[in-house]
From Swiss-Prot:
This is UDP-N-acetylmuramoylalanine--D-glutamate ligase. It comes from Deinococcus radiodurans (strain ATCC 13939 / DSM 20539 / JCM 16871 / CCUG 27074 / LMG 4051 / NBRC 15346 / NCIMB 9279 / VKM B-1422 / R1). It is an enzyme of class 6 (ligase). Cell wall formation. Catalyzes the addition of glutamate to the nucleotide precursor UDP-N-acetylmuramoyl-L-alanine (UMA). Keywords: ATP-binding, Cell cycle, Cell division, Cell shape, Cell wall biogenesis/degradation, Cytoplasm, Ligase, Nucleotide-binding, Peptidoglycan synthesis. Belongs to the MurCDEF family. Its EC number is 6.3.2.9. ATP binds at residues 126-132.
Length: 457
């Protein structure tokens, strides 16, 4: 859909959920950062001069707001519409007060769905694998001739892609799914459900309820793709997958699992295949198994998701900085080639460790603990460990990478140095991407020193 294909208005957006979006009143962007910047650009494109609020705005964000004509908000005022960033809890005091004064509180996903109702969206959520599955679905749809763009919880923000896509493939976090009441997706995917974000949701039940909002607005003509062992209440048609087979809805095998490229997880590929098929059928497009098979063979894994970033002799270095959920860390431990030097650290968010002990048994030779809660996590894991102390995140990562390599025997050693940190990045880094970049830089530095010493890399 090209920009302007759906009529725009500064008064009222298209109806969805039986309610209009009031862009003619006072609109507040609550929270900047990646999502807020996407909202700001989108509203500017709609001809809307909005207000914004952020407790600690970055100088570049303030400059962008001025450039786009958005003004800093007075929270003592009243607003008709508040577009809140996903990281702002739904029960935040400011939002409760604003709602009490008559504001409607929504998120970027609801804004996109209401103002671009003709754009088909595939929504993907889950505790682990949702980003990789999102990218895979978009790759498959592009191979089938559709202009599919991925966005949402992964880069870029959803609102950055809605005017340059025939199909939006949207990764949806539990935070985003708290603000999409009634969202109807022709195709929705749940990759799995584990434990995460208890600091935000308070309980596993509340976290799972937020995730299941992805199918709450679906109807009998829509499709929900889910794991075969995960029952989900829904009005949609249910299609299930397992990691053992890459097949279409009728059971026809498209590709042997063994033919997937390295770094592409079979469960993610199986879910992506079924979702792509469902969307093609929704649009009345042909489903060609040969095209889909070729696309799977050529699939590109997502950077920073269990990615091999270096090799020094028989020791590989794998970056999985985003692996902070138990289910994701467990998957990384089971996939990595043993023996493993496991880099664990960051800020503990209450991950369940028992499954990780089981996955590490007989595979992990040493835990390298770094960051704010690394030592505490290592002690709770009950595995042999050493603690890295450093002033900065980069220095900590340099030492952790070298310690991991040495734990595997250094030159002449074998195995995997695995960054699957369990803890979040916010103790020493801006986000998981910056932490992953630090790991990559540390690996390259180590490779450089060893190459200079005559070792093969």
């Amino acid at each position: 859909m090209v920009r302007g294909a759906v009529p725009r208005t500064t008064e009222f957006g298209e109806l969805l959920y039986g309610k209009a979006v009031n862009l003619g009143g006072r609109v507040l962007i609550y929270g900047l950062g990646r999502s807020g910047r996407g909202v700001a650009h989108f509203l500017h494109g709609e001809g809307v001069s909005a207000f914004w609020h952020d407790l600690r705005p970055a100088p570049e964000d303030e400059a962008l707001m001025r450039q786009l004509g958005h003004r800093q908000a007075d929270l003592g005022g009243t607003y008709d519409l508040v577009v809140a960033a996903p990281g702002v809890p739904i029960d935040h005091r400011d939002l409760r007060v604003l709602a009490g004064r008559g504001a409607e509180i929504i998120g970027e996903v609801a804004l996109a769905a209401r103002l671009r109702p003709e754009l088909p969206m595939v929504g993907i959520t889950g505790t682990a694998g949702k980003g990789s599955t999102t990218v895979l679905i978009a790759q498959l749809l592009r191979a089938c001739g559709l202009r599919a763009r991925e966005g949402g919880n992964i880069d870029p923000p959803l609102l950055d892609v809605v005017d340059d896509a025939e199909v939006a493939v949207v990764e949806l976090s539990s935070f985003q799914l708290e603000r999409v009441p009634g969202l109807r997706l022709p195709v929705a995917v749940i990759t799995n459900l584990g434990v995460d974000h208890l600091d935000r949701h308070g309980s596993v039940e509340t976290y799972h309820a937020a995730k299941l909002n992805i199918t709450a607005g679906q109807q009998s003509g829509d499709v929900l793709v889910r794991p075969a062992d995960l029952p989900v209440p829904t009005r949609a048609q249910t299609v299930t997958f397992t990691p053992e087979r890459l097949c279409l809805r009728d059971g026809q095998e498209v590709l042997p699992v063994a033919d997937l490229p390295p770094g592409v997880h079979p469960a993610n590929a199986a879910a992506a295949l079924l979702a792509a098929e469902a969307l093609l059928r929704h649009l009345g497009r042909a489903v060609d198994p040969a095209v889909l098979a070729d696309a799977l063979r050529a699939a590109q894994p997502v950077k920073g998701r269990f990615e091999t970033v270096g090799q020094l002799g028989e020791v590989g270095f794998i970056e999985d900085s985003i692996a902070t959920r138990t289910i994701a860390v467990e998957s990384a431990l089971r996939q990595a080639r043993p023996p493993i030097a496991w880099l664990v650290g960051g800020r503990d968010k209450g991950a369940e460790l028992a499954p990780l002990r089981a996955a590490a048994e007989g595979r992990v030779t040493r835990v390298i603990a770094f960051g704010e809660d690394g030592e505490a996590l290592a002690r709770d894991l009950g595995l042999p460990f050493e603690v890295i102390k450093a002033e900065t995140g980069d220095e900590s990562m340099d030492r952790a990478v070298r310690a991991g390599w040495e734990a595997l025997g250094g030159a002449g050693g074998t195995g995997t140095v695995l960054l699957a940190p369990v803890g979040t990045s916010f103790d020493q880094f801006r986000d998981y991407q910056q932490r992953g970049a630090s790991f990559r830089r540390a690996v390259q530095a180590l490779l450089g020193t060893q190459s200079g010493s005559g070792e093969s890399a």
